[in-house]
C-alpha cells in the first residue's frame, strides 16, 4: 500500500505530468488533449455537435493539419507546438460540453428509473 501511495504521489507531480505530456507526442502535430475523442460514443458526438462554430472549425483545422503532417512524416516547427500550460488552458475545450451531456444523460436515467418504479 505504501508503494502505491508513493507511485500515485509521483504521478500527480506537476513535473512528471509535463514530462509525460512531452512523451505523448500529439503536441508535435499541434493537437490538444480534447482533439482525441471516441467517434463512436454518442455522448462525445453530442458534445462535438454542441461546440460553437469557431471552436469546431479550430478543432477540424488542427485534425486535418495533423493528418497531413502524419501522411508526409513531418512535425510542426517547435515554436508552433502547444505548451503543457496552453494544453491545460485551451486544450480542454470539449470537456465542459461533455460534462453537460453526461449530466443530462444521468438525469434522464434517474427520471426513467423514477417513473418506472410505479
UniProtKB/Swiss-Prot annotation:
Its main location: mitochondrion. It is a peripheral membrane protein. It is found in: Mitochondrion inner membrane. Residues 1-32 are annotated as: IgE-binding. Immunodominant epitope. The keyword Membrane applies. One of its GO terms (cellular component) is respiratory chain complex III. Pfam families: UCR_14kD. Keywords: Allergen, Electron transport, Membrane, Mitochondrion, Mitochondrion inner membrane, Respiratory chain, Transport. The keyword Ligase does not apply. Gene3D superfamilies: Cytochrome b-c1 complex subunit 7. Disulfide bonds: none annotated. GO terms for biological process: mitochondrial electron transport, ubiquinol to cytochrome c. Belongs to the UQCRB/QCR7 family. Component of the ubiquinol-cytochrome c oxidoreductase (cytochrome b-c1 complex, complex III, CIII), a multisubunit enzyme composed of 3 respiratory subunits cytochrome b, cytochrome c1 and Rieske protein, 2 core protein subunits, and additional low-molecular weight protein subunits. The complex exists as an obligatory dimer and forms supercomplexes (SCs) in the inner mitochondrial membrane with cytochrome c oxidase (complex IV, CIV). Component of the ubiquinol-cytochrome c oxidoreductase, a multisubunit transmembrane complex that is part of the mitochondrial electron transport chain which drives oxidative phosphorylation. This is Cytochrome b-c1 complex subunit 7. It comes from Dermatophagoides pteronyssinus (European house dust mite).
Amino acid at each position: 500500500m505504501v508503494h502505491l501511495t508513493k507511485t500515485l504521489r509521483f504521478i500527480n507531480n506537476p513535473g512528471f505530468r509535463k514530462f509525460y505530456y512531452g512523451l505523448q507526442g500529439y503536441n508535435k502535430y499541434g493537437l490538444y488533449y480534447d482533439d482525441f475523442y471516441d467517434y463512436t460514443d454518442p455522448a462525445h458526438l453530442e458534445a462535438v455537435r454542441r461546440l460553437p462554430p469557431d471552436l469546431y472549425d479550430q478543432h477540424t483545422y488542427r485534425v486535418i493539419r495533423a493528418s497531413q503532417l502524419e501522411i508526409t512524416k513531418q512535425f510542426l516547427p517547435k515554436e508552433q507546438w502547444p505548451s503543457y500550460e496552453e494544453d491545460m488552458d485551451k486544450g480542454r475545450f470539449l470537456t465542459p460540453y461533455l460534462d453537460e451531456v453526461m449530466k443530462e444523460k444521468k438525469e434522464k436515467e434517474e427520471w426513467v428509473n423514477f417513473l418506472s418504479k410505479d
